[in-house]
Amino acid sequence: MLSASQFLKHRVSCLPMLNKVESDSTDGDPDDACQHPHDCNIFSVLVNGATDRLEGFFDESDEEDGDEVETPSTTTTAVSPSATMSAPSPTATAPTPHSGTHTPKSPLHSISHCPSFNSVAQALPHSLSPHSLCHTSSHEASRRGSAEQPSRTQSELARRIKTENILNSFHDSLEAAYEKCHGGANPEEHQSNKTEYFQQKLKGFAALDVDEQLIADYPVWLLKNVLIQGHLYITAKHMCFLSYLPRRQNANIRSGTLVKARKRSLREGTRYWCVLKNDSFSYYPDSTDVYFPAGTIDLSEALAAELCDDEGDVTEPESFRIVMPKKSVLFKADSHSAAHEWVKALQKEIFRAHNQGDTVRIVIPLQNIVDLEKTKIFEFATTIKTSVVESNETYAIDEYIFTFFKFGDDVLRTLTENGVEISGGNFSPRQSQLAVGHKHVTESVRDSTLLHASGHHHHFFHSAHHESDGKSNSKSHTSSRSHTPRNLTPQVTGEQPHERDEKRDSKLPRLPKFLRRFKDKVDDKCDDKPTLVPSFLKSRASSRRNSAEGSDRPNLASQRTSSSTLFPSAPPTPGSQPTTPGVHAPGSSTPGGSYGTTTPGTPASADSVSLAGTPGVAAPVGDIEGLNGNPMPAGIAAELKEKRKSGGATSSGAATGATTPGGAAAPGSTGNSSPGTPGGLGGPGAVGAGGPGVMGGAESAPAGTVPQQSHHAGISVVAPHDPAAAAAAADAAAPFTRGPGSGIPEIQDDSDSSDDDHWGHIGTAEVDEDPEQDTFKKKNKRFSTLSKVSDLWSGSTKHYGKHHTERLGDDDDKHLASAEEITESNERFQKRFALGTEERLIASYHCHLHRGGIPTYGKMYVSTNYVTFRSFLRTKTLMIVPLKVVENATKDSGFKFGYSGLVLTIQGYEEIFFEFASASHRDDAEVMLLRQLDIIRPHINDDIKSDDQYMLQSARLCTYEDALKAEANVEMPPVIIDGNLASVLPGLVTPQSKMLFTLLTIGSRGDVQPYISLGKALIEEGHRVRIATHSEFKDWIEGYGIEFKEVAGDPSELMKIMVDHGVFSVSFLRDAASKFRGWINELLASSWEACQGSDVLIESPSAMAGIHIAEALQIPYFRAFTMPWSRTRAYPHAFIVPDQKMGGSYNYLTYVMFDNVFWKGISGQVNRWRKKTLHLPRTNLDHMEQNKVPFLYNVSPAVLPPPVDFPDWIKITGYWFLDEGSKDYTPDDKLCRFMEKARNDGKKLVYIGFGSIVVSDPTALTKSVVESVLKADVRCILNKGWSDRLGKKDAKEPEIPLPEEVLQITNCPHDWLFPQIDACVHHGGSGTTGAGLRAGLPTIIKPFFGDQFFYANRVEDLGAGIHLRKLNVSQFSKALWEATHNERIIAKAAAVGRQIRSENGVISAIQAIYRDLDYARSLVQKKRGYTPTSDKEEETWTLVDDIERQMQDEVEKHNL
């Protein structure tokens, strides 16, 4: 019977087998797939994974059928391992496509191939059944309470994820819901009803017509800049792609240290702690100060994330950039793999940020499809490139790349039977454009992944059903608030079109390698320019320019601008009407060569095109770049250029507002082309007129004059030289000027004036103003400026919603902002703090933030989920605090006279203090905060998923990418699997061959215990594990099924000398050198013997031999330890802890000093051992490169926050707990009665135990403990380990009589005992410290030696305990009372416990090992054959030494 980990590993091992061909049907039992992993291949994994899930699409009940069906919530699920591993049903056959007139028996292909829950459950071992997962005795559950944290090894992880995913599978759940409501029908009626049920759900979700029939359903992958798993639904009129991409709110997707470049050079950079979340990328000066970022990047505005070439290494760059509309931000990682992982994570999150909502919905009308081309991008899949007309307004061609691992030919057949033509790649670019001209398009493509240029989505899917008359999309565009696209300012330039294209292309984001490779392949197939290159292979602007030859549409890389009037690439059908006032209808070419014939009610000129977001305002074209920077069609541009040179016809035509087919003015035309055209934009001097008009004046102005520019109402054009034309232009734009009577409200800034230029003038056109309006504008601007300054210094308060001011009547709230101001302020707030478009501003206050004793003046914002702050007056303080971590907001007095204070209590953080100039403002802020806290607290955990599920999804995600990359030999785009949370932690990619891990350590029981936990998890991964340590731990280690090898040394002697000296000192070195010189030789020899045959070596650095053994064996080498051993400025070396904090320079110096002194003491013996036993040359500190060795710290990040100066290969994984309490432990009845009596008496329970330390006077220590317990009035559970070693008396017999308030025990598992007591006292060992804090216990630490002093300081710095420097009755009793009664310490310890319980250090360690395995191997290989240059004599003999050793190996190998 397979274990859960084996079940998972077999599936992972199947992934790289791409060369096998999978048949569509299987003759054997589908459950046999679990027993024969080598029969699987990537096809079965990917296809079944794709067909397994479309969860979350139809989670709302259908109101039309009136059934209350329980469907899965929108929480995230992953591709079920069980589903992906199940072979197709033996009866499943390839689906037969059907036309729209014939009703198929079963159009849902994925349903017919989806394994049911029962069949998958039968394939599971009995131990993995859902029943077994819930089995926990009520007694044990009641004992552990909230502090329970079971051991989550890979086996348990696989069990939980498997069951949850089976239950949450879309098809299983939807079928189950259907069976619940419609069960009992005959088979034919049953299938018909099921198809109708799915159709109804699809119509509501994709906004289709009520009578539209579902024809077929296929699993598919959409290839954009990421690879997205989803489903393709073909109906009678549409082709719909649906995929579920839920998000985990406020979750850290990836974090680590990066160097941020300054001045575009990595030579001048600052190292930051960087955190990637759903919609933002933030960097912090310190990993502990996570509420005050140094900067935040809004990913909804990011264009791309890509690797960039380093100055030193182009093949494996360690740098990457985040491309923004106006700049690029450069970062440098510590390794190429780390940079690659950051880029993959950023690409996924940028895509999610651009997508509308948590689902990818693309609805393509079949009538819009211009061409279907079957291409060969992947050798193992069918790829279909679909060219579609975007809308009847732009007639631009979009391209969608769909990849099918099955049913590719069936999809083509189904589409052709529904009237879609297939070119087979024979269409030229010109033929594609001609095909567009003959298309009768009445609908627009609806794509949730495309944005406005301002970062806001089109709301395509608001209504349940869309309109099919071609107007619905326009309504949706105009109903939402219009945003001015960026980079739309027309510019007069003398450059040739091809020169502008080259410059523009050079500024576009550079394509990744895998895209450039695909691009080159496609370019070779094209006759002309690479016009048929898919849009994901080139920038959106470049693709649109080449494919449509001048589809002049505003765009921002892959983002889409708001609906605006643009020239189509080919004339539409005659009679088409514009959908919005002031928008040009596509004209038709005439024999006279004129283009752009206008229709009634449409202001137009032959050479103008209206600006986005401003109805009726036109801008010229010609050789001037269009709204998105793309050139006009060549024929139109040449014609308009010729007209401007002639100077007559265009001007006349534009002045009258209409043109004849020949381009002349229509007789009798007036300035107002129709009653519906505002402002008479077709009148004399209208914007866009040629000759001496607005733009024409730039060419016709006298020599030596420079056209002026003016700003008015956010519209920007080059002002004419002719005053009359200028006045006419001002009159034309007057109705669109902000101000009284204009109809456009004046923007009211909430003192965020720094962003006005960005939001008000980017990408807009400017027109001149008349003197009266200019005077009014200046006065209004002065008044607005004075108002802002007054608000800035008076500490004003503003509310941004009536529903948040219940304590006042709507008419009485003097702080309520206007509707326009609410909109503008929300936009600026969302942009500044990068919190997403769903975050809404509630209130804002001017106040001081006190941080580090220094007041900083700025503005505090309260939003739906955050309280934020930004500073004024040239400072850069930024604060972002989620409301879910705010425990309370309380009033306080201010530091300055007359000021009022507000204190925010934060979970696991220091209080944040605000100071207000007025008590009323402070009170208002308190009310708003507390009210919002009451609103969100019931929903804090609504979107939180299981950490196990979150982790395994990312593992599967990386496995898909790595497998495809390995077999297809191409650089794959990042993969987003349906239902994935996009965690980018390094995946659990199990090595193809099982390995022997040797774990080498010395010391006490606490030093060995973490390695047992790691060894158990590695065994469940399928590897062999060996622990090499002292002989007294042999039975304990072998009891867990782990191999044991002995190394020399007596732990008791080691601890005695360390206790005697306490810390690392000169006397310690002198005694150690005299007593342990012989022991070091034995340790080195025994360690070498214990590591023979190992494939990977993980060593505690205190063992001293591991790095040399790994070099001799040429195997990957890792270090793992419980205390700081790597150089950093954040903490001192654990053996050299000062009495007071000495700063970063001193901390770093302690590591340098320790490394040199430690190596000086053992270097002679080590080098002799290397030469004699290992046959290696002498070495030194520089050659060993210890700082480059991958390091695993088995400590929680809550206790040891990662320093910013730690490189990427140093990981703080979390504690490696060995939960022995869950291993059939039965507590002593005497202990249970003692604990119950203490509870009944209302006394606090305290555990006191100092581990296996050695003390000189055990009786005196016991006496001090007993007297302190009695004085503090607590009950004590005493574990007297200090008498177990080197004592004269029996350790089980007490030295002094113990009172009834004290119960002595021998051994009791910490994971069983600690959740049931109130505080703990111990020696400060890493394992005991972690166990106590995990249970949320206030901790008292009395250190004796080594790292215990370090952890005593850390616990005290965290506020979760007390560092007891002297163990006497007075100080110990006081500490006991503080730990059991101080609410501040109790609350802080509970917060740290919650964080530790959310971690899984063992799984994180295995992830780090797998990820850094190649890196560790490269370090060892680089050292091979090295000889220090300081010893030239030995250097000459190095090669001979190596040859002799190799020859000896060959002789022994062949038994010669």
Swiss-Prot record:
It is found in: Cytoplasm; Membrane. UDP-alpha-D-glucose binds at S1004, R1005, D1007, N1279, N1307, H1310, H1323, S1326, G1327, T1328, D1347, Q1348. InterPro entries: ATG26_PH_GRAM1, ATG26_PH_GRAM2, EryCIII-like_C, Glycosyltransferase_28, GlycoTrans_28_N, GRAM, PH-like_dom_sf, PH_domain. Keywords: Cytoplasm, Glycosyltransferase, Lipid biosynthesis, Lipid metabolism, Membrane, Repeat, Steroid biosynthesis, Steroid metabolism, Sterol biosynthesis, Sterol metabolism, Transferase. It catalyses: a sterol + UDP-alpha-D-glucose = a sterol 3-beta-D-glucoside + UDP + H(+); ergosterol + UDP-alpha-D-glucose = ergosteryl 3-beta-D-glucoside + UDP + H(+). The keyword rRNA-binding does not apply. One of its GO terms (molecular function) is UDP-glycosyltransferase activity. It is a peripheral membrane protein. Pfam families: EryCIII-like_C, Glyco_transf_28, GRAM, PH. Residues 251-351 form the PH domain. Residues 137-146, 496-508 have a biased composition (Basic and acidic residues). One of its GO terms (cellular component) is cytoplasm. Its main location: cytoplasm. Residues 200-247, 827-893 form the GRAM domain. Residues 71-104, 576-606, 647-676, 719-735 have a biased composition (Low complexity). Residues 60-113, 128-156, 462-512, 524-776 are annotated as: Disordered. Its EC number is 2.4.1.-, 2.4.1.173. Belongs to the glycosyltransferase 28 family. Sterol glycosyltransferase responsible for the glycosylation of ergosterol to form ergosterol-glucoside. This is Sterol 3-beta-glucosyltransferase. It comes from Yarrowia lipolytica (strain CLIB 122 / E 150). The gene is ATG26.
